[in-house]
């Protein structure tokens, strides 16, 4: 779906083990995501989806293996080095300063990202969000839920990132606003930004994604084009309900998870 022709992976997890103390969440995880694509991470709660984003953003260091961004090993990198590599993270929930204006939130967000000045980039970012632009002097708390999520994404875009990690962007948003957010992510990917996304709204997310990766207990159990998974009528039950998933055989046989989901 992406307009970018890039066979070389932008993101690569190679035998990654990561977790907290003695509890490992990612277990020998390996996968690749190409430049200018949207890769959707699927799986039940506790599968390790959000942990993938956290390890890539340096919030959790791998115990084993390598995480590469265009060949750069991010495993031992500092937050400053990761930002310099162009990795932006939009976590779950609301992470704004409610009493500050839209402009002030963007300005402070730029400072947090280590930028010396954001004045020239703020107008550039606001062009993506016409409704937010109209309320540039309004307090963030006065924005709708959708406008607040757009503002959070806008702060990430100040970095002009080559990779955006986004965790559950549809939470608390109306279907119309979710469609706008997804449309923006697709536009960014088509212009070269690599997007790694966790999203419970599986069918809608698959429609804008290029690849889908299914995790279970921190392990890769399936990776295939999103369009192929979208054709499965049991897709949401399959990847949110914890059914064990295995890749389809070369002759097109159904996955074991599809068979389980189809059973009465």
Regions found by a protein language model. Name each.
Residues 57:
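Helix-to-loop junction immediately C-terminal to a conserved catalytic motif
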Residues 42-44:
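The feature captures the beta-strand-to-loop junction immediately N-terminal to the Walker
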Residues 65-73, 85, 118-120:
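Conserved ABC transporter NBD signature motif
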Residues 21, 39, 100-120, 128-133, ...:
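ABC-type ATPase nucleotide-binding domains, specifically the catalytic core motifs of the NBD
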Residues 160:
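Conserved catalytic motifs of ABC-family nucleotide-binding domains
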Residues 156-157:
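ABC ATPase C-loop
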Residues 139-143, 147:
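Conserved ABC ATPase signature
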